[in-house]
């Protein structure tokens, strides 16, 4: 654990020569450490970091909103607005002088040697979540009223604590401008603290660029996962004699009932791929619906495909489920909760008319979801209108969370090893251990048209329903799932006729917690 404290001290050692990219990288690394590895202890009570903001000024990072101060690193500091900061190393000259009115003053000299800043604690939550300190003033209350003559063991201090894998999102800092205040008037007011400073216009421009920087880090609530769900819904189209698979539907519903899961029926659907148009459940009381306009329906060369698009608002009517909405275009199958993250393929960029790796859009996506997103690469192989082409780009065809920091990945690497390696590398960068399902070196003639679908299984609580196809890979896939989910009951169902259409059990179902 001491290694974590040593690393934290190193990261906190910002200085006057660091460039903006280095500083921003430090912000992110420090936030991750504070959320995952530290807490504030006051007496016997432990508080976890819920929301923090970063401020730092040097000649390469002129964040003029930062309060000037003298300090060594890792000192608590009550700022000018009554909030509490955790300081970075801070040095700035101060001297006597005469202001514009001829009055004697003792003010700061802001020059290229100056550097200062800290981390504003904006929100804390007790470890049992019973006590939330919301706002800088409330957080600073922890540091008030301590004994003047005796050593006070209740004074707050940082402690190492393993908080597990924590998700967070970045947002712009709050209250940098108030009311009708302009950038110029705000900066001019700040410059009143200084006897001398760099060019005023340059600082106006700097503030303009910094005011929307996403230097506020917000810890996310825990995502709901399949292991916590207890209800399953299916579309009645699945049992349609003409367009569905009635025999499979009967076998599936019987299997679910044998697992003590009573399947329920969705209304007003237009096809049986329920996952893609139904809302994602983020936690027990929060659902998010999105714009469902997938290119594989709307841009298909078969005009009838567009007519099968389901509007989930109609489906939800009468279900007693309240949703918030986003205008972003998303497919439900392209959102796989993995620990604190939602894993999506980069197809979400193109569906929303954005360039891949557009950082502004990714920030918007995370803000709308309220959770951090891991983007994995996806590439379409084959002709868009060919029946056997994966034109969907759904992450539920690639990965599944197994609990903790473990992810089970499908057998994409059998056909496209470089693409699979890129996905695995990204997931490992976020702290996950990845197990890939592989069949190419274990069976003579692998059925690539079917064996991709094992990863698209359905999990409800501790029950797993996995697809099988009466092929050699079935037993190998069962072993992968058994090792990844040792505490789950694993049941199997033959469904080649569905998988050949490009989806499997996760695609045709909608499981939630009620």
Each predicted region: which residue ranges?
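A cross-family signal for N-terminal binding/gating loops and helix N-caps
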Residues: 2-222
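The feature marks the mature, well-folded catalytic cores of soluble enzymes
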Residues: 221-514
């Amino acid at each position: 654990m001491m290694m974590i404290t040593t690393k934290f001290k190193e990261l906190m050692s910002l200085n006057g020569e660091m460039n903006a990219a280095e500083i921003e990288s430090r912000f992110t690394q420090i936030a991750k450490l504070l959320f995952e590895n530290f807490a504030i202890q006051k007496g016997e009570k432990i508080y976890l970091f819920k929301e923090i903001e970063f401020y730092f000024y040097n000649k390469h990072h002129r964040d003029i909103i930062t309060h000037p101060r003298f300090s060594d690193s890792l000192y608590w500091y009550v700022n000018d607005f009554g909030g509490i900061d955790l300081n970075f190393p801070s040095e700035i000259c101060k001297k006597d002088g005469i202001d514009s009115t001829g009055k004697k003053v003792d003010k700061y000299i802001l020059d290229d040697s100056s550097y200062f800043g800290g981390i504003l604690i904006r929100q804390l939550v007790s470890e049992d979540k019973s006590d939330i300190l919301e706002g800088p003033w409330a957080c600073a209350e922890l540091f008030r009223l301590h004994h003047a003559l005796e050593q006070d063991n209740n004074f707050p201090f940082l402690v190492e604590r393993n908080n597990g894998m924590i998700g967070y999102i970045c947002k712009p800092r709050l209250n940098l401008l108030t009311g009708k205040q302009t950038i110029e008037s705000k900066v001019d007011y700040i410059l009143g603290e200084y006897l001398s400073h760099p060019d005023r216009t340059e600082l106006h421009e700097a503030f303009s660029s910094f005011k929307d920087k996403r230097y506020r880090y917000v810890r996310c609530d825990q995502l709901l996962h399949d292991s916590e769900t207890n209800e399953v819904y299916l579309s009645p189209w699945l049992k349609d004699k003409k367009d569905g698979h009635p025999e499979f539907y009967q076998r599936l519903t019987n299997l679910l009932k044998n697992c003590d899961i009573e399947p329920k029926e969705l209304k007003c659907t237009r096809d049986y791929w329920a996952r893609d148009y139904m809302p994602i459940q983020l936690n027990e009381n929060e659902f998010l619906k999105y714009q469902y306009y997938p290119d594989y329906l709307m841009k298909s060369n078969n005009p009838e495909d567009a007519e099968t698009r389901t509007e989930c608002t109609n489906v939800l009517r009468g279900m007693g489920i309240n949703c918030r909405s986003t205008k972003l275009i998303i497919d439900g199958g392209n959102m796989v909760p993995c620990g604190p993250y939602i894993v999506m393929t980069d197809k979400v960029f193109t569906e929303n008319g954005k360039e891949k790796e557009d950082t502004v859009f990714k920030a918007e996506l995370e803000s709308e979801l309220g959770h951090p997103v891991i983007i994995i690469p996806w590439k379409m192989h084959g002709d868009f209108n060919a029946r056997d082409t994966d034109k969907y780009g759904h992450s539920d065809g690639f990965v599944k969370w197994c609990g903790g920091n473990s992810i089970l990945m499908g057998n994409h690497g059998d056909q496209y090893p470089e693409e699979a390696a890129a996905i695995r590398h990204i997931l490992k960068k976020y702290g996950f251990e990845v197990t890939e399902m592989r069949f190419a070196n274990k069976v003579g003639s692998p059925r690539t048209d079917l064996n991709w679908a094992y990863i698209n299984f359905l999990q409800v609580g501790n029950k797993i329903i996995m697809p099988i196809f009466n092929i050699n890979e079935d037993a190998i896939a069962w072993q992968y799932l058994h090792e990844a989910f040792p505490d789950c009951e694993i049941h199997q169902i033959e469904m080649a006729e569905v998988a050949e259409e490009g989806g499997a059990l996760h695609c045709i179902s909608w499981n939630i917690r009620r």
